[in-house]
Amino acid sequence: MSTIMVDTNSELCILTPLDEDDLESPLSGEFLQDIVDIQDITQTIGDDGSTPFGASEHQFFGNSPGSIGSVSTDLTDTLSPASSPASITFPAASGSAEDAACKSLNLECRVCSDKASGFHYGVHACEGCKGFFRRTIRLKLVYDRCERMCKIQKKNRNKCQYCRFEKCLNVGMSHNAIRFGRMPRSEKAKLKAEVLMCDQDVKDSQMADLLSLARLIYDAYLKNFNMNKVKARAILTGKASNPPFVIHDMETLCMAEKTLVAKLVANGIQNKEAEVRIFHCCQCTSVETVTELTEFAKSIPGFTELDLNDQVTLLKYGVYEAMFAMLASVMNKDGMLVAYGNGFITREFLKSLRKPIGDMMEPKFEFAMKFNALELDDSDLSLFVAALICCGDRPGLVNIPSIEKMQESIVHVLKLHLQSNHPDDSFLFPKLLQKMADLRQLVTEHAQLVQTIKKTETDAALHPLLQEIYRDMY
């Protein structure tokens, strides 16, 4: 038996990292590709980087020493001395710089729109589609033809392999397009520009949708309400051709009842006392406004698709808040318009009426003065009223997520609209949110007062529709 002599005193040859010139050589490229192929074996056995084996049960697919999955590190450990201060790192085919670029740019896979992990086979792709394409090419797989032209997305990319491979080819994946090294600055700049342009396109599309929503709501507002702020302000400021008839005492009230609201007081209440007649007229006006608000709500995108019970609930709790918000448009510090703007009843006369009916309108005037100070126009009010109706926190709602989604869209477009329409008042939006809370309190107090009137005023019958709204409200 011959003896092998080993010179233990000779110096070991320390391996050094490869230079750029070495990496650019064809031989190095082939060697590195072989290393990449070994690294990706476990990823390509199962789609999307997963394997049919559990790593804990089959350690040769894990990262244990000597395993295939850790060949990059273990190969280095085998070739270099134990005392070596550093290990060799082989660049992946896509390049760590490109992987970092993909992550920083949030690029999507060109095939399935999942998050791209790098530049694979000529396009930015995710690990799943990279492995799928490599497996198909290497194994020369042929898939059953599909004529449905399936849409390939992250959630369904494994369902139709034929269409997935066709998508890979259509977006430009090619086995000959493997690239080594860093992403050129010019290409990175181009990618950044594309991402920014894509983001801007998305923002522009979202803005267009919001503007469309605002326009639909505003058009519905103008269409469904007999009185709006533009008309009311023209009358209240004396710009209308026919000034309203002023009701300031019992005599002028009787005159108005014979002309302006003759139909309202002709149903057997003309002989009742003034407070009862006024309460009756207020109810008639409220019923008409509830009808207008119902038609307006139906024009809000998505409202009629809601559960019917939810539609009723939203209107039940929202109509009076919306009504009092719009009532402010026909009010000033001295009084309010009535009879479609043909009459004007003074604030002092309303306060002089017998209690509790005499207490009914004063809280609305106090709210209106503060609300009118915000100087909203009809486009602002239309969105505000829509937001009041579509509130997802009303009691008894069934499909809350859908309603909250509607409300979120409306409130968002309201905020953007206020920023555009009132650029000098940055606090207008939070002020309006506070007004929503104020309106809830106002409606609660009004409902309590109506119940008091119902109990104490035997002649003051409540309209059936309003009675249904008030039932179990608060």
From Swiss-Prot:
Keyword Secreted tagged: no
Subcellular location: Nucleus
GO molecular function, one term: lipid binding
Stored Gene3D superfamilies: Erythroid Transcription Factor GATA-1, subunit A (3.30.50.10), Retinoid X Receptor (1.10.565.10)
Domain NR LBD, residue spans: 245-472
Any one of the GO CC terms: nucleus
InterPro entries given in the database record: 1Cnucl_rcpt (IPR003074), NHR-like_dom_sf (IPR035500), Nucl_hrmn_rcpt_lig-bd (IPR000536), Nuclear_hormone_rcpt_NR1 (IPR050234), Nuclear_hrmn_rcpt (IPR001723), PPAR-alpha (IPR003076), Znf_hrmn_rcpt (IPR001628), Znf_NHR/GATA (IPR013088)
Biological processes per GO annotation: cell differentiation; fatty acid metabolic process; hormone-mediated signaling pathway; intracellular receptor signaling pathway; negative regulation of cholesterol storage; negative regulation of inflammatory response; negative regulation of transcription by RNA polymerase II; positive regulation of fatty acid metabolic process
Pfam families assigned to the protein according to its UniProt record, in alphabetical order: Hormone_recep, zf-C4
Renumbered zinc finger spans (NR C4-type): 109-129, 146-168
Tissue: Ubiquitous.
Keywords recorded for this protein, A-Z: Activator, DNA-binding, Lipid-binding, Metal-binding, Nucleus, Receptor, Transcription, Transcription regulation, Zinc, Zinc-finger
SUPFAM superfamilies according to UniProt: Glucocorticoid receptor-like (DNA-binding domain) (SSF57716), Nuclear receptor ligand-binding domain (SSF48508)
Residue range(s) of DNA binding per entry: 106-180
Signal sequence annotation: none
Stated family: Belongs to the nuclear hormone receptor family. NR1 subfamily.
Function: Ligand-activated transcription factor. Key regulator of lipid metabolism. Activated by lipids. Receptor for peroxisome proliferators such as hypolipidemic drugs and fatty acids. Once activated by a ligand, the receptor binds to promoter elements of target genes. Regulates the peroxisomal beta-oxidation pathway of fatty acids.
Subunit-level organization: Heterodimer with the retinoid X receptor.
Name of protein: Peroxisome proliferator-activated receptor alpha
Species this chain originates from: Xenopus laevis (African clawed frog)
Originating gene: ppara
